[in-house]
Amino acid sequence: LPGPGAGEPVTVYYPSDGPQGPVRQGFHTVLADASGAPRRGNGRLVVISHGTGGAPYVHADLARTLVAQGYTVAMPWHAGDHVRDHRPGRFDSLKRRAQEVSRAIDAVGQDARLAPLLALDRVGVYGFSAGGFTALTLAGGRWSPQRFVQHCEAHLTEDWHFCTGVITRLSGGWLDGLKRWVARHEIHRRFDDDMASYGHTDPRVAAIVAAAPAAAPFDLASLARPVVPLGLVTLGQDRWLVPAFHAEAVLAACAACERVADLPAAGHGAMLAPLPPGLDGVLGEMLNDPAGFERAALPEVDRRIAAFFSRHLGVGAP
């Protein structure tokens, strides 16, 4: 779908009775009916928010699981933070992302083919990584650049890749001190002037799952009582968003939150399904599966996510 106004497009997966054939999406091919008429499913919409520099098609496996249970799935391309247009280094995208989810719901509601088949008063949201940050925002979380600065001052070494990205790694060598100095200097230069806090909720959103969310910039008190049911997926070997500072910190602050699934052997890229091929360098170290992790576990995780939405969106058993 075209994005509302001049916004980025929204990729939509939906139930259809048409014949399936190979459809190329980015680096992989899915079996789908690319132009088939949508049919009525369970009447509910789930919005998937991709990670930084990502794309909707890396969540195709989850989308297909949801569609098989009757959901329509909308996946906005987050402006300035997707594979075709990636401008890292600022919080511009994070300030827009939750609103882009709301606009994706608007786009579906304005589509003459889809709108009559859906009730948009109870929408689900799933987000991974920066998409998990988006999900936490929609759950009522308040965040600020200054909390990011404070976190990285206190935990720069332990949470290096969250604070600096995947440009370089700490190696234990003599250059590490210089890398830390440069990182601190850049963090303060870019963010010291932004003293605001940010948030955005949408009354149509009724259930949220955040997988490996970036959570350190949040005031955890704002997530102690989410505005809607909130579930988390945790990845035990995540080196990009170290769980103790992110997903586990949310679970510790939020007694009502549910751990939808835990993958103790999984790295950060586990929830990219399919995983992009040919990842190397520091990015490959962050996203490629660590030894001992089996992707055979992922279909069950997808089913648990779908079950969480079904419980909280009022959907009966398929």
Residue ranges: model-predicted function:
Residues 134-138, 219:
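Hydrolases whose catalytic domains are alpha/beta-hydrolase-1, hotdog thioesterase
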Residues 51, 129, 212:
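Catalytic nucleophile serine of serine hydrolases
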Residues 20, 34-43, 48-86, 239-243:
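Short substrate-entry loop that stabilizes the transition state in hydrolases
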Residues 1-46:
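Domain-level recognition of soluble alpha/beta enzyme cores
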